[in-house]
Amino acid sequence: FKKFGEIYFSTIFENKIKAWHLHKESHLNYACISGSVKLVLFDNREGSSSKNMYQEIILSQQNYNLVTIPPNIWNGFKGLNFKESIIANCLTLPHNESEMVRKDPDDKIFNYRW
């Protein structure tokens, strides 16, 4: 954990998807504090050894982890197995809409089946 910028909580319902977004400068620190989610990361950074690769991580109260996501990694999540799940995100910078990029879940650059 590098530093504290802000924390927010995101609610997601079962089988719903919140994707895709990235932060150009901030590191994200996700933890699932209630329910269960599938967190998906996608790297399309030029020169990265993991370029065009996905990583799937199941977060829940039973599989409790803090996942740190560096800048410029696309991410999104899907609610699993619970009516409602809550994700905590502790960012390293205060909220700044101009350092975020958003895409639709079915955007063609991802080619990902939720």
What are the roles of these predicted feature ranges?
Residues 1-66, 80-114:
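Non-catalytic, conserved peripheral segments adjacent to functional cores
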